[in-house]
Amino acid sequence: MLILVSPAKTLDFEQPPLTQVYSQPDFLTHSQELIQVCRQLTPSDIATLMKVSDKIAGLNAARFGQWQPDFSLDNAKQAIFAFRGDVYTGFDADTLSEDEIAQTQSQLRILSGLYGLLRPLDLIMPYRLEMGTALSNPKGKNLYEFWGDTLTQAVNEALAESGSDIIVNLASNEYFKAIKPKKLQGQLISPVFKDCKNGQYKVISFFAKRARGMMARYIITNKVNTLAELRAFNLAGYYYSEEQSSPTNPTFLRAEQ
């Protein structure tokens, strides 16, 4: 199985990584193009474009200015250990074994507005550039037009290397929109996680993000290869609901927390 996840806004470049092993992102020339565009933006432009505070806009203007493509462990960090959002809390990369880190490197891919498609051990420098950002660039009016078919092709290549024909989409809609589903050369499965609230089951963003991270970790740790094994996911009180599921959207429910 090849697993797709989103990145996170929250970053940690303070804690040392779990391993000294790293790889370099595949699309750094693309990243450099975007950085050149972003460097032309003032902090005020960034605040408006990204809908962030002046403080965060200033921080990201500085990040764009400092960014350079010669990554090492002295100035960058592996993506899986740098991202610290709800998905990554659920994934809990800091407790991976060496074998699991290696497995994650071959099975997990992180969609990114700036870096395109990251392997877990790819080095990144701090940034904020969400995939849905309407950033005009030489290839179009937003990042979806900038990346075009590039990321879909990269996913197909990663899928072929994995030896599987199943893609488990645990990314948000914003990020998965950078992929062209009809051009994928495998079976696309997009799990859904619903929590009970006031007697009704619904997707609650905070819980669903954590569940997506937990499922990604579950696939790695348990060496899940089949859809039947995927449906056995039962962490944190979630259970598979055949009634609410469709062939491409296995749905997992959880009682009110």
From Swiss-Prot:
Pfam families associated with the record: H2O2_YaaD (PF03883)
Q: Offer a single GO CC term for the protein.
A: cytosol
Q: Which N-terminal residues, if any, form the signal peptide?
A: none
GO biological process entries: response to hydroperoxide
InterPro entries recorded for this chain?
YaaA
Which family, according to the similarity comment? Belongs to the UPF0246 family.
Q: Supply the NCBIfam families for this chain.
A: PRK02101.1-1, PRK02101.1-3
Protein name, per record: UPF0246 protein Sbal195_1149
Source species: Shewanella baltica (strain OS195)
